[in-house]
Design a protein with these regions (language model features):
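Two-component/phosphorelay signaling modules centered on CheY-like receiver
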Residues: 16-35
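Acidic catalytic/metal-coordinating carboxylates
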Residues: 39-42, 66-69
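Active-site beta3 strand of CheY-like receiver
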Residues: 51-57
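Receiver (REC) domain active-site loop signature in two-component systems and cognate sites
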Residues: 62
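Short amphipathic alpha-helix used as the core "switch/output" element in two-component signaling
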Residues: 68-79
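Alpha4 helix (beta4-alpha4-beta5 surface) of REC/receiver domains from two-component response regulators
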Residues: 69, 90-107, 111
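C-terminal output helix
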Residues: 93, 111-124
């Protein structure tokens, strides 16, 4: 079963170059990047006036509100949103904590871009089955 509308994605990262790079690469693969923010608080503020995306690609270590705290808010107020931690932080430390909080996956920023694409495909397939 195919979704009628393209999956929508948000990118939340305090590094503007990373946001632009990820947006460009995802857009070139046909993904619809609908929101960007430089920290969790800015993203939450934008969610109150915009349609929530299907998937959030979320950095962990950001000023104002980090990815962990953002995840708690997202799962409380937008429980259907899928969350992929996208970070340079140590996976062994943050993966388990992120899953506990409700994140759906973790991709290292220095991993091949195909890993992020594969994670997105996996989450889209899970959503189509549900």
């Amino acid at each position: 079963m195919k979704q009628e509308l393209p999956v929508t994605i948000a990118i939340v990262d305090d590094n503007a170059l990373i946001r632009e790079s990820v947006k460009f690469r995802l857009s070139s693969l046909g993904y619809n990047v609908v929101l960007e923010a430089e920290n969790g608080q800015e993203f939450l503020d934008k969610l109150h006036v915009n349609r929530a995306p299907d998937i959030c690609v979320l950095d962990i270590n950001m000023p104002v509100m980090d990815g962990m705290e953002t995840t708690v808010h997202l799962k409380k107020d937008w429980p259907g949103m899928k969350i992929i931690f996208f970070s340079m932080e140590d996976r062994s430390i943050y993966y388990s904590k992120g899953i506990e909080l409700g994140a759906d996956g973790f991709v290292a920023k220095d991993a091949p871009f195909a890993e992020l694409n594969n994670m997105l495909i996996s989450l889209m397939n899970q959503s189509q089955v549900a």
